[in-house]
Curated annotation (Swiss-Prot):
Metal-binding in keyword set: yes
Active site: 70
UniProt name for this protein: dITP/XTP pyrophosphatase
Catalytic activity: XTP + H2O = XMP + diphosphate + H(+); dITP + H2O = dIMP + diphosphate + H(+); ITP + H2O = IMP + diphosphate + H(+)
Organism in which the protein naturally occurs: Methylococcus capsulatus (strain ATCC 33009 / NCIMB 11132 / Bath)
Native organism taxonomy: Bacteria, Pseudomonadati, Pseudomonadota, Gammaproteobacteria, Methylococcales
Length: 201
């Protein structure tokens, strides 16, 4: 029987993506919402700090090993914003569309050559709430920000993140291509490999 692992997210898009990406880890993955665990307050100043806050929070509430990620969009012309504030860029209760609207407004008039950006992801695994040696993996996906939304797949900033060499936005990529290329896919591949080593898989 596979060991259970709690996934520290209530974001439906992220849960769906991570369940696919970590499915080879040898663990049975349970979203924290299924266990009645509320979202942790993300008070960290970095992606690593926020990912650890979420993972330890889920482990403490569930008594299970936990995995969490923190990720965001860094836009060169905005000095790296929205960064760790990506999910709340337009305010605490902002929707994906609200955040995209604010981003496009901030980049209004910025020419294509200055719209470089990257998605960054830090993914962590803690064995329990007292784990002093968490596993940490990172991924980075370079691209640039388009002037309009394109595509209906994915979530977050995917409709305005243009993927080099494809002519597509992240929201237009087939899921298997996105999982292979993305920041989250990169981090998950590293972490899944380490988890398989832990479980002997």
């Amino acid at each position: 029987m596979r060991r259970k692992l709690v996934l520290a997210s209530n974001n439906a898009g992220k849960v769906r993506e991570l369940q696919t990406l970590i499915s080879t880890s040898g663990f049975e993955i349970v979203p924290q919402g299924a266990l009645g665990i509320p979202e942790a307050e993300e008070t960290g100043a970095s992606f690593v700090e926020n990912a650890l806050i979420k993972a330890y929070h889920a482990a403490r509430h569930s008594g299970l090993p936990a995995i969490a990620d923190d990720s965001g969009l860094e836009v060169d012309a905005l000095g790296g914003e929205p960064g760790v504030h990506s999910a709340r860029y337009a305010g605490p209760a902002a929707s994906d569309d609200d955040n995209i609207d604010r981003l496009l407004a901030a980049l209004d008039g910025v020419e294509a050559g200055r719209r470089g950006a990257r998605f960054r992801c830090v993914m962590v695994f803690v064995r329990d709430a007292e784990d002093t040696g968490p596993l940490i993996a990172e991924g980075c996906w370079e691209g640039w920000i388009g002037e309009n939304r394109r595509g209906s797949g994915g979530f977050g900033y995917d409709p305005v993140f243009l993927v080099p060499g494809t002519g597509l936005s992240a929201a237009e990529l087939p899921p298997e291509d996105k999982n292979r290329l993305s920041h989250r896919g990169q981090a998950a591949a590293v972490l899944a490999s380490r988890l398989r080593a832990l479980t002997g898989g």
